[in-house]
Regions:
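Short, charged recognition helix plus adjacent turn
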Residues: 2, 58, 68-71
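DNA major-groove recognition helix of helix-turn-helix/homeodomain DNA-binding modules
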Residues: 51-66
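Amphipathic alpha-helical segments that mediate coupling or scaffolding at interfaces
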Residues: 16, 41, 67-70
Length: 71
């Protein structure tokens, strides 16, 4: 995944998280994804895997296609 796509994906995750009023730890608890991993994704420094993205979008109450729309 290109670095700009990683950054855009992380930004989108952050936007969706903020819309719920969640901190990184809240998303970590709801998704089962470690807080450090959430932080790395938010900064665009870690490439998200499909399994991780599915856990995150499920916790955020959205779909993968909706989250990635426009990226």
């Amino acid at each position: 995944m290109a670095k700009d796509i990683c950054a855009a994906t992380g930004e989108r995750i952050r936007e969706l998280r903020w819309a719920k009023g969640w901190r990184q730890i809240d998303l970590a608890e709801h998704s089962g994804v470690h807080e450090v991993h959430i932080s790395d994704l938010g900064r665009g420094t870690r490439e998200p895997g499909l399994r991780t993205l599915n856990k995150i979008v499920s916790a955020l109450g959205t779909t993968l296609s909706e989250m990635l729309r426009g990226l």
